[in-house]
Amino acid sequence: MSGHSSYQPSTGIERWLDTRLPIVRMMYDQFVAFPVPKNINYAYAFGAILAVFLIIQIVSGVVLAMHYVAQDTLAFASIEHIMRDVNYGWLIRYIHMNGASFFFFAVYAHTFRGMYYGSYKEPREVLWILGVIIIILMMATAFMGYVLPWGQMSFWGATVITNLFSAIPYIGDPIVTWLWGGYSVGNPTLTRFYSLHYLLPFVIVGVVMLHVWALHVTGQTNPTGVEVKSEKDTVRFTPFALTKDAVALGVCFIAFAWFVFFVPNYLGHADNYIPANPGVTPAHIVPEWYLLPFYAILRAVPDKLGGVIAMFGALVVLLFLPWLDGSKVRSAAYRPLYRIFFWLFVADCIFLGWLGAMPAEGIYPTLSQVGTVWYFAHFLVIVPALGYFEKPKPLPESISAAVLEAHSRPSLLARLINR
């Protein structure tokens, strides 16, 4: 998608800098004049939303780190100090807490959009793999951040999740001891998690830069899945795509503000407002909502090692999706059978999320096993089979042809009026 630069320095300073460090030219080419397909919809705005929320999380996290004390006897009190004594500390903390939830909601929506429109297919395999790596890094960062308040759910969540490594034969127990910094979760564990929680967002920034670089090499996908064939198929990123992203961000910020100011603890857990007590186990240990589907997969397998393999396998299988899907058609808009199974997969992920919040008793483990089998069957059986047997609809000749065809059809309102 890259071509000859259209940037023209307008001042002497810009011309001087352009001959020595053409950073303004690079920003102009990548974020102003960059060509994007003219038919992208609001589903493509989640990338911009993710970029903004990554910045919000880093800035709010750095400010919180100035007042947080990574010591097991003071961590909980330091959080209360932030809430009560630091100017606008309550606001910064609630922004950081709910920002994490919105960050994950956006990344899941971004991933589902990529699966629906085939954004993982050739030549965008590396782009997709980098995206999956970002999700894995986000989960690690979020888990470590969940431990820092040192409440009941923080302490016992850290105990349960880190204990999973003990399932690894021969080396599992030494790994757990190394993670804990001793023989139980304590102050060394907290300081290690605090250090890594501060570091990993900047690692995510680095991978995001590679992700954006890969995107700008291969170009943006679009709802038809047809590649750009001429300049008629594209528009400039600024102002066209930027305006669409701004509208989506505005709607997102309205919802975000509602959570921050009116229901800031709705997505959290009440037990985390109780100081950590190694002698009292919570009745029901659960992670944050955005990790619940994988927690359900973990608990679906009775064997401890099998559960760990299944949980990590649920992420690893995403890395191989570009090669599991053999269909020549990218977009689900032209794949009727794939579209049905895609929405069943989305429903299964939501189902697993609900099961992850339920106690591991009664019928819930059995339902988790059903949901887990369907999750892996989607990638390992259904998607490869559809690539061979599905008969897709005819593709448009170009993006421009698809846009003209869509505009030639009467709108829903017009069809209702003409009845």
Swiss-Prot record:
One of its GO terms (cellular component) is respiratory chain complex III. Its main location: membrane. It comes from Blastochloris viridis (Rhodopseudomonas viridis). Keywords: Electron transport, Heme, Iron, Membrane, Metal-binding, Respiratory chain, Transmembrane, Transmembrane helix, Transport. PANTHER family: CYTOCHROME B. Heme b b566 binds at H110, H211. The main subunits of complex b-c1 are: cytochrome b, cytochrome c1 and the Rieske protein. This is Cytochrome b. GO terms for molecular function: metal ion binding; ubiquinol-cytochrome-c reductase activity.
